[in-house]
């Protein structure tokens, strides 16, 4: 990836900066980092607004963000790496690796087989753990134990329903199959070789000092909103499980490296992470005709939302564009047909639908015109 030598020297697209400044003026966000890239270069990288309003801290291009569910495609990538190594198949029943999940039943008492593919496509029917159960779990093994206690919500494969439990279970499968902890596997096989030095479940103090504050609306202003997922624990604390469904922190340039590996069909800077056919499988619709995603016209791949019929918030994207959002408004979308990657980093806790936020719409419209 050809990156600017210094962030402040990065190329900028004025229309994107103006669009984000307008979002700040309308109190939608405090600040934003935006990035537009191709397969091998950055076309735009910019920070506008503030990372911390009270302390007048400007947003910077290396500001750290809780990327929440943008963790999910990374978890899926790790699963596909293990499939390529011959250590698992996405068609395997999850019970092959976690025997406690062997006899899952729907409410009517019928037993069903849940496969890894069901987990990757949010079609497993697995029920969630409670917030209290999640916060009390110190590792993935403890967390997954809670999933065995509940009936399936529907027959696997019959419906799409966004499922944190399924993705978290995949994280535990990664540990069992690889013999490494989930964070160690990601660090060794993705973050270190890709140069994603600021992508972590457990920020250092230096990284935490760069974290953009999360905000929610209070009338026509913004007020701080702590990250609920972590239950008030210090972000630097290791006393929590590394959440495969949404525990990562990252920066726009870091996440771009991951996206460039995907848009380059599994290879970046001469290092092959995945085979081309594996990336094609991940980023093509695997959910059939099931109504999928949080905005109209989408399907689901293996860990990725896929734009089936561009419309509304996706109208400016090509069919087949794939990406994922995060709970606090972060977004990353890969339009392979146009050779474009679009990354938006913001921290807004109360967007009614972060995938359909006015900030995402403004960014994508400015970035594609």
Question: Predicted regions span which residues?
Answer:
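Short, conserved catalytic-motif segment at the N-terminal edge
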Residues: 8-65, 103-104, 141, 145, ...
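Extracytoplasmic/secreted envelope proteins and their assembly/folding machinery
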Residues: 13, 17, 21, 33, ...
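Short active-site loop at a secondary-structure junction
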Residues: 22-35, 54-118, 154-165, 243-246
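Short, surface-exposed loop or secondary-structure junction motifs
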Residues: 50-52, 105-319
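Short, surface-exposed beta-strand/loop micro-motifs that present aromatic residues
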Residues: 328-341
